Amino acid sequence: MSIRRLACSLLLSSLALPVLAAECPAMLQGELPKLRAKGENIELCQYAGKPLVVVNTASFCGFTPQFKGLEALYQRYKDQELEVLGVPSDDFRQESADSKETATVCYVNYGVTFAMTEPQPVSGANAIPLFKGLAEQSRQPRWNFFKYVVDRQGKVVASFSSLTKPDDPELIAARREGDRLATLIPSRFTALHPSGRWALSVCLPRLARRRTQFTRRALQEQ
């Protein structure tokens, strides 16, 4: 997978105009309890108008080391308004029943600084509204560390399986597809080309031709 492809997706993600706080998309309306924050909640509408990566996480999964890549992604692009939201879940039987242990894994073991919620159901009929909304626009998680790239207008630009790492170029390209910033998402994340210059005349046709192909490959990964 080329870095150019990932960069193109991220660039297009950046093109969406910022959304006013008053224009909170339906999917982002509501709040979720913040992990080990003594009653503090995360207002999802704060993400309106920003590129967002939503990930369902688990503390005892083979993909748990992806926390490191997600944090690196967040640190690299947070100055460009990228947000990452981690939602722990025991839907796949790999999360602790003790949120203190969940917090230790992400905050202490992996140094996570992006927002994390208390464990939530993310699939099936019991999924929280946020994940129902994500699934309606894409598909529901089939395993832990399923990644959704959401643009500034609350639209899912792309989704990536657990196999896609946070530094994957295609994930970063998807982030650009929803925001004008040019470098953001994981799928098998790799660093964006240093020049950061990608013409729309190149990116738009490229994505138009390859999006269907990529979707098919992503489904096959599952």
UniProtKB/Swiss-Prot annotation:
**S-S pairs:** none
Q: Which Pfam families match?
A: GSHPx
Q: Which PANTHER family match?
A: GLUTATHIONE PEROXIDASE
Matches recorded under SUPFAM superfamilies: Thioredoxin-like
List keywords of the entry alphabetically. Oxidoreductase, Periplasm, Peroxidase, Signal
Per its record, how is this protein called by name?
Answer: Glutathione peroxidase
| Keyword Oxidoreductase in record | yes
Q: Which gene encodes it?
A: gpwA
Q: Does the keyword Manganese apply?
A: no
Source species, domain of life = Bacteria
